Amino acid sequence: MYAVFQSGGKQHRVSEGQVVRLEKLEVATGETVEFDSVLMIVNGEDVKIGAPVVAGGKVVAEVVAHGRGDKVKIVKFRRRKHSRKQQGHRQWFTEVKITGIQA
């Protein structure tokens, strides 16, 4: 059984027991989070597709940790001008463990 849900402007395909990194959520570590915007639920041959979301569909997860991703380097270079600009970015994330999928 797996589900596709939306969080932080992105869609995630998950199954029970899976650990997923999402955009940062303002929830404390160890708390439970419910995602109501479930787009699709598949249980063997039974497929439920929402228009746009599945009615009564829910993905339940437990917050495992918060952190920051790897550094992404941004470089702006102007040729022949002896000019260069360097910048870095580390995106915040929340790691959750999927504990249940309800149809």
From Swiss-Prot:
The lineage of its organism: Bacteria, Pseudomonadati, Pseudomonadota, Gammaproteobacteria, Pasteurellales. This is Large ribosomal subunit protein bL21. It comes from Pasteurella multocida (strain Pm70). Part of the 50S ribosomal subunit. Contacts protein L20. Keywords: Ribonucleoprotein, Ribosomal protein, RNA-binding, rRNA-binding. InterPro entries: bL21-like (IPR028909), bL21-like_sf (IPR036164), Ribosomal_bL21 (IPR001787), Ribosomal_bL21_CS (IPR018258). One of its GO terms (biological process) is translation. NCBIfam families: L21. The gene is rplU. This protein binds to 23S rRNA in the presence of protein L20. One of its GO terms (molecular function) is structural constituent of ribosome. It comes from the Bacteria. PANTHER family: 50S RIBOSOMAL PROTEIN L21 (PTHR21349), LARGE RIBOSOMAL SUBUNIT PROTEIN BL21M (PTHR21349:SF0). The keyword Metal-binding does not apply. One of its GO terms (cellular component) is ribosome. Belongs to the bacterial ribosomal protein bL21 family.
